[in-house]
C-alpha cells in the first residue's frame, strides 16, 4: 500500500525547497540576461528560403518553430503545418535543427510562406524572435499565431478551435494558462490580436529579448515574461481551458476516487500526483490535466514530452491513445513513428506508453 501521509510530507518538503530556490531567480536571471545582451546579435539566421506562399493575401500569420536532431520533418509536423494553412495562416517555418536537408524543406514548402533555418541559440523564443522580425507588416496583421512542435495534434480542425477567439474580450489567447512562477499563457500555441501586435510593449519585448541558452531562464523571461509584459501594458488574455476550472474538475475526480479507489491508484507516483492537485499547488496543466483538457475542453493537443519522458510521473498515461480516439480520428501512428525513431536514434528502449496500446 502507498503511504499517502509520507508522500504528502515529501511533496511539502520539496515545495519548500522550490520556494527557497525561487528567491534567487531574479538575481540569477539578471546575470544571465546581462551576459546574453553582451553577446547581442541582430539574428541567428543561417538561411532564409522562399516557399510556395499559398496564402499571399491572408491577414493572419503564423510562426511555427521546429527542432529535430537529424533535421527531419516528421509526419506529425507536416500535419500541423498543413493544418495551420488550412486554418488560413500564412506560415513562416523556423527550424532550429543542426541541419535541414532539401527533402525536409520540400515536405512543408507547399504550405509555407517561407522557411528560416537558424542556429539553436535561444531555443523556441530565439526562433520566435527571428520569425517575428521577418514579418514586415506586423502592425497591419489581423492576427499572429506562435506555435511549436512540442505538441502532437491537432486532434480537431484548427478553424473550429479558433472560432472561439473573441477580440472584444481578449487581446491575446492560448490553449492553456499556468500559474507556475507567475500567471502566463503557455506559448506552444499563442494567438495575438491586432491590439496586442500594435502595442509598443509587444515590439519592445522582442527587441530587448536576448538570445540565451539557458532553458529555465527562457521559461521565466520568455514564456512567463511575455504574458507579464503584456499584462503590465493593460492587455487582456483569454484561454480555451482556464486553469482553475480544469483544476477543480481534476480535484473532483480525485475526491471521488478516495471512496472508490481503482487498482491504478496504487501506481507509484499516484499519491504525489494526488497531493499536488488536492493541495492546490501550481502545476503544468498540459501534463497534470492532459486527459481532462482533451475530453472536457476540446484541447486539440497533447504534449510530446509527456508521452516521451513523463517527467512529472503522471499516472494512467498509458490511456493516451484511448483518450485521443474518444474525441478524434487523429492518426496516432504519427506519434508512435516519431518517438520510436528518436528512441532508436538514442539507443533507448521505447517508452511503454508509446508501444503499449
Model regions and ranges:
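ER/Golgi luminal nucleotide-sugar-dependent glycosyltransferases, focusing on the catalytic module
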Residues: 2-357
Amino acid at each position: 500500500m502507498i503511504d499517502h501521509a509520507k508522500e504528502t510530507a515529501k511533496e511539502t518538503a520539496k515545495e519548500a525547497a522550490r520556494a527557497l530556490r525561487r528567491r534567487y531567480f531574479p538575481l540569477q536571471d539578471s546575470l544571465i540576461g546581462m551576459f546574453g545582451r553582451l553577446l547581442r546579435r541582430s539574428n541567428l539566421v543561417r538561411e532564409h528560403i522562399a516557399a510556395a506562399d499559398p496564402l499571399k493575401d491572408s491577414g493572419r500569420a503564423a510562426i511555427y518553430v521546429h527542432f529535430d536532431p537529424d533535421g527531419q520533418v516528421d509526419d506529425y509536423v507536416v500535419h500541423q503545418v498543413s493544418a495551420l494553412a488550412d486554418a488560413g495562416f500564412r506560415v513562416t517555418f523556423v527550424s532550429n535543427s543542426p541541419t535541414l536537408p532539401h527533402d525536409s524543406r520540400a515536405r512543408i514548402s507547399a504550405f509555407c510562406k517561407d522557411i528560416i533555418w537558424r542556429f539553436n541559440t535561444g531555443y523556441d523564443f530565439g526562433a520566435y524572435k527571428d520569425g517575428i522580425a521577418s514579418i514586415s507588416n506586423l502592425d497591419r496583421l489581423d492576427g499572429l499565431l506562435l506555435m511549436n512542435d512540442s505538441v502532437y495534434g491537432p486532434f480537431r480542425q484548427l478553424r473550429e478551435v479558433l472560432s472561439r477567439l473573441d477580440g472584444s474580450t481578449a487581446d491575446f489567447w492560448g490553449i492553456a494558462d499556468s500559474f507556475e512562477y507567475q500567471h502566463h499563457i503557455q506559448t506552444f500555441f499563442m494567438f495575438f490580436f491586432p491590439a496586442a501586435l500594435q502595442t509598443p510593449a509587444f515590439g519592445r519585448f522582442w527587441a530587448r529579448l536576448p538570445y540565451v541558452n539557458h532553458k529555465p531562464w527562457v521559461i521565466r523571461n520568455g514564456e512567463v515574461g511575455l504574458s507579464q509584459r503584456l499584462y503590465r501594458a493593460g492587455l487582456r488574455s483569454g484561454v480555451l481551458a482556464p486553469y482553475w476550472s480544469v483544476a477543480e474538475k481534476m480535484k473532483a475526480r480525485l475526491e471521488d476516487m478516495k471512496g472508490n479507489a481503482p487498482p491504478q491508484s496504487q501506481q507509484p507516483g499516484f499519491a504525489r500526483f494526488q497531493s499536488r492537485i488536492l493541495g492546490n499547488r501550481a502545476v503544468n496543466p498540459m501534463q497534470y490535466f492532459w486527459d481532462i483538457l482533451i475530453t472536457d475542453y476540446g484541447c486539440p493537443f497533447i504534449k510530446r514530452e509527456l508521452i516521451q519522458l513523463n517527467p512529472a510521473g503522471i499516472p494512467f498515461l498509458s490511456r493516451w491513445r484511448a483518450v485521443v480516439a474518444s474525441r478524434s480520428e487523429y492518426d496516432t501512428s504519427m506519434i508512435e513513428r516519431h518517438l520510436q525513431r528518436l528512441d532508436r536514434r538514442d539507443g533507448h528502449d521505447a517508452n511503454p506508453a508509446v508501444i503499449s496500446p
